[in-house]
């Protein structure tokens, strides 16, 4: 079996590894804050650099372990010197890793804070006037759609003749033409007679002022050609006599007219208390 030269191992592998680690550490130390900022700003390059460094350190560790075991078997003095030299290097590597992780974590936190603040600033609130205008416009559009007139509306009914006549009377006589008091048959005959005797003197306005009715009522009385028959005239005369007696009895209760035997039974008090039973009792 071929022998291994211990001196060649001491000169080649440990020295090469030491020089590589020292050069890596020196490059990290010589890099200033500006370079660190650049690395923190560009996370892609930092992660790339970090992965390369991790792979390199991971590949170095098993090689160091194998070399240390082999050297300890060959030369205990060389292994002791190698372990003493690698100890500070391991500590320096841990410090570098901590610094790099802190540098990587700090820009991520700052980025998250700034992104959250930008989102809050850019996100419009729901109570902004633009949103209110949009909601109002949408509501108005919905109302306009609901309130649209159908394409085929129902045809309006043509008003009848009596409706047209009633509307014309309302426009002509705002206060109404119906008299506030009833005219007796004698008054109606007197109006017709006066107008027939002297139409120029007893005009419609004069007769309306004299009988306290509207001019339209006088015009209708003069225009009508209806005349009652004899039986109708007799019935109307009796009805007006009863009306006269009832009014007289009411005024006598108020003390404005003297009480008479004819009107005493027609008073409101007797009608309410006894009605028609008083006459039946008197006869019995």
Swiss-Prot record:
Composition skew (Basic and acidic residues), residue ranges: 157-175
Listed Low complexity bias regions: 76-87
Ranges that cross the membrane: none
Keyword line: Mitochondrion, Transit peptide
Biased composition annotated in UniProt, kind: Polar residues: 268-284
Location in the cell: Mitochondrion
Chief localization: mitochondrion
Compositional bias of kind Basic residues: 133-144
InterPro entries in alphabetical order: NGRN/Rrg9 (IPR010487)
Pfam families xref list: Neugrin
Family, as annotated: Belongs to the RRG9 family.
Matches recorded under PANTHER family: NEUGRIN (PTHR13475:SF3)
Known role: Required for respiratory activity and maintenance and expression of the mitochondrial genome.
Protein's UniProt name: Required for respiratory growth protein 9, mitochondrial
Native source organism of the sequence: Aspergillus niger (strain ATCC MYA-4892 / CBS 513.88 / FGSC A1513)
Gene name tied to this protein: rrg9
